[in-house]
Amino acid sequence: MESIRTAIERASDYLTEHPEAATASDSVAKAVREDGLRFRVEGPWSPVTTDMAESVGGAASAPTPGWLLRAALAACDATLVAMEAARDGIELTDLEVSVESESDFRGVLGVDPSVHAGPLSVRVRIRLTAADATEDQLRAIVERAESRSPVRDALVREVPMTTELATD
């Protein structure tokens, strides 16, 4: 915990003094089709494979992209909670974040153009305990973590997005 707090303080101090260093391009994620609806997503770390359910033509051999979205939110929120607890000097004894969503697949399949393709709703459940913290302290940690979670921010804020098409 102390090493996390020290690293956060060092990075925060540096970016306070050098705000021009705070903006950078994120690593590229590239999805390459393997077969059918199965894709290998490549980046700077281990590749990830996705697939779709058999009901829509996939082989159900790997997580769906929608599940990876929920996994990204769960991992990001959990990471930020751990960082905020470390910043406060609170040793967590348990931290678990689960993310559920509801979707209407008419949107993905184009059956009804009025139905959104993305989740209709998302529920985040956080189980958090610490021997040396009150419930109010833990709630404050979660509130700060949620306000600083990049994945959560990308989901709730309208982020400018462009698409470039190459057909060669």
Regions found by a protein language model. Name each.
Residues M1-A71, V81-D168:
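Extended beta-strand/beta-hairpin segments
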